[in-house]
Amino acid sequence: MRILIIAIAAFFFSNQLFAQGCCSGGSGSPIAGGTSQGVLAERQVEIGMSLQSINTDKFMIGDKPTKDYLKNYNSNYLYSRFAYGVTKNFTMSVEAGYFFNKTQTGLGGEKVFDKGISDLIIFPRYDVYTHNTEKTRDEITLGLGLKIPLGKYLDSTVSSVNPFTGAKNYVKMPPVVMPTTGANDFIFYGFAFRGYPEKKFRIFANAIYIRKGWNALGERFGDYASVGLFAGKTFFKNLGITLQLKGEWIDKMDYDKQIGKDGMLAIYNVDVTSFGSKKIAIVPQISYPYKSFSVYILSEFPLYQYVNGTAIASQYLFTLGISYRFFTVKQKG
């Protein structure tokens, strides 16, 4: 049986959940739920769901904290995945998510809020190397995915009301509260695993690169790269403890030069100087399998952050998930 490890890389993308920006930057969903994964066994099915919650009142200029930006940002995201082992080496998954809320609270208590479906993710993975002995299990998996936006990326909110006529003036909501960026993105993924079954110990790593596309507004949010190093051990038969060291990088935003000349960036509520960041974090996780089910919980703790301009910083990230695996045909033996 091929290896499928439920070890959330807290965000494939915590960046995808709130990203960067003055009046906020990128938006979208955590690609593939952040799961560090190999492939399923042939004709094995996995159905997974997780709830990811972000809350922060931490904002930064470069690597220094600031209190003159926003009061709070929070989001709650439901991620779902259906994966199928087409062959012993090839797994196909279809993934999607829904934001219950993406809320930005200003210094005066004013709130900007949105919700809705985010993206559809088609994510095939192929096991390019497997070698098992009595003492070790090795696996290398590569993946190439596509993110297709389904949700809103252009929405507005009331900015003021004329006291005499009652007429309402609207402004575009900042990208950070939009459920998606409105662009097609390509996902490049690598996963390497070594396990020591007798010792119930495992080490593994993943690398992710997301090449962001252009949306209809002439915006291209910054590319994303992440590397995760994991170590895990099983205690008391089924209790899995995993610790991840994660580094991530988000590039600056690009935009069509014509919308810059026309002053549309201000109308779009975007400050391109406040996009992009670097972060190092540790992510502890606890998982517990029971029969065909697995339950897991994790949280992310940033060790170092740097943002371009003035931007939202990572503070609290929490994930609770469950997965169910079964075979479409009865296994021999």
Predicted regions and their residues:
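Short loop/turn motifs that connect adjacent beta-strands in outer-membrane beta-barrel proteins
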Residues: 21-23, 36-44, 89, 130-139, ...
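Residues that define the transmembrane beta-barrel architecture of outer-membrane proteins
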Residues: 41-43, 74-78, 114-120, 138, ...
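Detector for outer-membrane/organellar transmembrane beta-barrel domains
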Residues: 42-55, 169-263
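Transmembrane beta-strands of outer-membrane beta-barrel proteins
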Residues: 45-49, 92-94, 122, 138-144, ...
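Transmembrane beta-strands of outer-membrane beta-barrel pores
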Residues: 51-57, 96-102, 128, 146-152, ...
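Surface-exposed strand-loop-strand hairpins of Gram-negative outer-membrane beta-barrel proteins
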Residues: 52-77
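Outer membrane beta-barrel transmembrane domains
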Residues: 58-60, 66-68, 218-333
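Outer-membrane pore/translocation modules
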Residues: 104, 110-206, 212-213, 269, ...
